[in-house]
From Swiss-Prot:
Major subcellular location class: membrane
Subcellular location as annotated: Cell membrane
Organism per entry: Oryza sativa subsp. japonica (Rice)
Glycan-carrying positions: N195, N279
UniProt topology in membrane: Multi-pass membrane protein
A UniProt-annotated Pfam family: CASP_dom
Transmembrane segments: 162-182, 204-224, 241-262, 281-301
Biased composition (Pro residues): 54-65, 89-132
Low complexity: bias regions: 32-44
Protein name in the entry: CASP-like protein 4A2
Subunit structure: Homodimer and heterodimers.
Biased composition annotated in UniProt, kind: Gly residues: 22-31
């Protein structure tokens, strides 16, 4: 328990020599007056405290140790297990290196600087396409030819080609049937083409091809002269395409059958003027087949083209 420090009484003030002498020379004065004066003189001054000895703090209260859980339960206390150490990686032992008397390899040469090609210039923007002119103009004889006239040029060339093909087909069919018709009572046997069905078939096909080619020739000639078809064009195109195809197939089939029959005749009886003239007619029929095939292509073009 700490003791509070109480203020010590202030010491009495020192008396001056004059006051002391006065006091001594007046013995008859009362002691009470002298004490009262001394209190008044020292009432306004602070009292001085002397040095006090330091007191030591009280000793701490002794603490009794608390019994552990093992002591309370009465079981023996086992020491804590030692901490586990983590395995440290140790590099495998390396065999000792043999002494190499050769000098160390020279340091690699510095790599040559890689030359970076300069960046390619940016591509220029493509120019804007020119406006398309609906009608092409061609300068011819200081005049402007409109687009419709340019479209008529391929048509005129195609019509001339078809006209030439019709003339050639008519002439070839006429020549084939004329040679075959003249092949009568020829050779040592005085044989005739009319005795064989294959040769009669070839003769009939050549007659049909000649008549059809002459008819188509006059139709095309009138179209080129008047620029007008004799029959409606859609139906006329179908008719031309169909007839060209049929006559081409008939010519190739009749010529093939006649060739087989003449070859059999030569194998049995030998060669004489009769089979030679028959072979000539068959060769002309093959040529007529090629012309009709060209005419069939032109007819197909006219049929499937929309601007005619």
């Amino acid at each position: 328990m700490a003791l509070e420090a109480q203020p010590s009484p202030s010491p009495s003030p020192r008396r001056s020599p004059e006051a002391a002498a006065g006091g001594a020379g007046a013995p008859g004065g009362s002691a009470g007056d002298a004490d009262a004066q001394a209190r008044r003189a020292t009432s306004g001054r602070p009292r001085r405290r002397g040095p006090q000895p330091r007191r030591s703090p009280p000793p701490p209260f002794p603490r009794t140790p608390r019994p552990s859980s093992a002591a309370r339960t009465g079981k023996p206390v086992s020491p804590p297990p030692p901490p586990r150490k983590k395995p440290q990686f140790q590099p495998p032992p390396q065999p000792p290196r043999a002494w190499d008397p050769s000098p160390p390899p020279p340091p690699p040469a510095p790599a040559a600087p890689v030359l970076v090609p300069p960046p390619a210039p940016a591509p220029r923007p493509a120019p804007a396409p020119a406006p398309r002119v609906p009608a092409r103009a061609v300068e011819h004889d200081h005049r402007v030819v409109p687009d419709i006239l340019l479209r008529k040029r391929p048509t005129a060339v195609l019509q001339r080609t078809a006209l030439v093909a019709r003339v050639a087909a008519a002439l070839l069919c006429l020549a084939a049937l004329a040679v075959l018709a003249a092949d009568s009572r020829k050779g040592f046997a005085l044989d005739s083409y009319s005795n064989y069905s294959q040769l009669r078939y070839s003769e009939a096909v050549n007659v049909i091809g000649f008549v059809y080619s002459v008819l188509q020739f006059f139709v095309l000639a009138d179209l080129m002269r008047r620029n007008k078809h004799l029959n409606p064009r859609r139906k006329g195109d179908y008719f031309d395409f169909f007839m060209d195809q049929v006559l081409a197939y008939l010519l190739i089939s009749s010529s093939s059958s006649a060739t087989a029959r003449v070859g059999d005749w030569i194998d049995n009886w030998g060669s004489d003027p009769f089979p030679k003239m028959a072979n000539s007619s068959i060769a002309i029929s093959f040529m007529a087949f090629l012309v009709f095939a060209i005419s069939a292509l032109i007819s197909a073009y006219n049929l499937f083209r929309r601007d005619i």
